[in-house]
Design a protein with these regions (language model features):
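Surface-exposed, low-hydrophobicity beta-strand/loop segments enriched in small/polar/acidic residues
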Residues: 1-123
């Protein structure tokens, strides 16, 4: 029998938000960010204002959590437009949020704190 594995769904991490037209925005994910899944925590690149996956060791602004990707995108070879949860009040399922592999506990806590400052609470 074949076993199927279901990946994350668009917005599947969301528990509650005050009003989708307030909490969500369409942004640009920078070329080179690769394939990103729903629930990926993003950082905002200071120069140009585009987003990429959270990169705790970076110094270009993407080391600071700035939102959570709504749906899967492929920004491997070109910029990609996508919807992101940028502000709260919103509650998301912590177990469905994607943080960078190898992130330390301190880096994870910094990301959670940054999201909380935006009104995005992880439970």
């Amino acid at each position: 029998m074949t076993t199927l594995t279901e990946g994350p769904h668009p917005g599947g991490f969301l528990v509650w938000e005050v009003l989708r037209d307030y909490t969500r925005e369409t942004i640009t994910v920078a070329s080179g960010a690769g394939k990103l899944a729903p629930g990926t925590v993003l950082g905002k690149i200071t120069t140009g204002g585009k987003y990429t996956g959270l990169a705790p060791a970076a110094t270009n602004g993407s080391q600071n959590a700035a939102g959570i990707l709504w749906a899967a995108i492929d920004a491997t070879d070109a910029d990609a437009a996508s919807v992101v949860i940028l502000r709260g009040p919103a509650i998301v399922n912590r177990s469905e949020i994607i943080l960078p592999e190898g992130a330390t506990e301190a880096q994870i806590n910094a990301a959670i704190t940054a999201l909380a400052a935006l009104g995005i609470i992880l439970r």
